[in-house]
Amino acid sequence: MRKIYTIETSNFEQDQLHFSLNDNEVNLQLKPAGQLIADSDDFAFIYLLDAGEDYHYLRFPPSSWENLVHILQKKKDPILRINDEAIELINFYDELEMLVYNIEGNYNYGAEFVQTVEQHFKAILAE
């Protein structure tokens, strides 16, 4: 069964962003799938986590996008902390950079979503 985890807490450790996921499930076996998609209906970026038989979603709402700007500025993949385990979210930086530039001015994503992305990532898009 697919689960959606919303990222709400983060911190920097040694110049690298760490997202926290506190889940009470025992033996939560998730592997980074290396793919980030845009959910223009719910205004979020979704990182896919391989759970074996299906994918789970790591959801980044606009309240977390300031941290995503830092990822693009630092050019480093973030770390996901699940309880005591640290997992590097591979390809996150590359996928996010590609998506942000693809969304810019592309109203196939919906005008409101495009405007919200352009506003949050204006420092990156201005480079």
Curated annotation (Swiss-Prot):
It holds the Pfam family UPF0738. It comes from the Bacteria. Belongs to the UPF0738 family. This is UPF0738 protein Bsph_1225. It comes from Lysinibacillus sphaericus (strain C3-41).
